[in-house]
């Protein structure tokens, strides 16, 4: 019989909370998953909460990753939704998406929030910093990637990191849109910020297949299709608790996100 283990740290609040929700949802499908803080793989299928703590488990393969959501600006979107994928995350994950519901995108993004693409031909090349390389192997470290951007492009500015929770969503939007007024292109390695900037009409240069919006390279006219797809890649805690997500992801099928 297939064994399942949810790798979560009891010392990390969101992991401890979500692990119980996952366990309850799987039980409704007759799947008995144990919760463990073991840093090694202990089951046939591993369920990993986040990409930072469980890299040894990840390296053994056959795992499902629960990671940061792609869409939504409100506190509930941030704290009660996660993207779920097989054997990778962001652009490298397999999200098993089928039967698109065009209305799902509206749960996270209003029509009026999706802005027309901006054309600032002489504008700023916006460098979007991130914690590390993700799973990119093209650079030795994240600073080497930054150096690459500075050497290759002119008029580079670093994106300011502003949290909507600190200033409120509407004030945050105003500040972000003000910063983006003179941006020609945003340069992103593989951060979920690419989805946010795509919504705000910024041309995104994806420098790694791990970027959630890598599939838009040369196909910006497919923006709405990609955003709708991303809405199907993330799940609300209620959908995880009732086991709805498992109906879609119990079988590892479909392309990686960067291949769609």
Features from the language model and the residues they span:
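Flexible, charged surface loops at secondary-structure boundaries
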Residues: 1, 38-46, 56-60, 117-122, ...
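N-terminal pre-catalytic "stem/leader" segment of glycosyltransferase-like enzymes
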Residues: 1-49, 133-134, 247, 252-260
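Short loop/turn segments at strand-loop or loop-helix junctions that form parts
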Residues: 5-9, 66-71, 122-134, 159-162, ...
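Catalytic donor nucleotide-activated moiety binding site of glycosyltransferases and closely related
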Residues: 8-11, 128-129, 133, 142-177
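Short acidic, S/G/P-rich loop/turn micro-motifs used as interaction or catalytic elements
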Residues: 10-17, 53-57, 131-137, 163, ...
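Extended catalytic core of nucleotide-activated donor transferases of GT-like folds
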Residues: 29-79
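Donor nucleotide-activated moiety binding/catalytic core segment of transferases
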Residues: 35-40, 154, 158-212
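Leloir-type glycosyltransferase catalytic cores
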Residues: 79-122, 136, 214-260
